Amino acid sequence: MLRKLVTVIALATTPAWAAQASAPFTGADYSGRYECTGQDKHIGSYKGVVDMALDAKQSTGKYAAYTFTLTLEDKSRYDGMAAGTSDALGVYFAHTDPVLKDFGVGVAQMTSTPEGKVSFVKYYYTPEYEGGGHGLEHCVKS
């Protein structure tokens, strides 16, 4: 009897939002390939390419979810994910070699170049890599 009562109470108090389907994605889609230059505390200047793809199943309303890969000129690769809205993304990334402990978080501000190309500036923080570090990356959609 007590079990039935608890079940009824649990079902009756389930929030209405829990049963609703996700709203379709209506935000900006920043998917694509970006040419990047950066300045890192440890490696100095670098160049690379970011390939970013919208995860449509996890994007809803104005909120976007992405997966991405940054490949540097020396073929080092970082896999990551981002989530955001409008013109700002929160970012997580990690080098494909976990032994390096080269992973971090960042914030990316989406904008347009004077020529009208989509671009972003990303500030990032790497807490473990060689005692910690940070960097700034400028990327333009190609």
Model-derived regions: residue spans:
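Central antiparallel beta-sheet cores of small beta-barrel/beta-sandwich binding domains
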Residues: 20-142
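Bacterial N-terminal signal peptides that target proteins for export
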Residues: 1-6
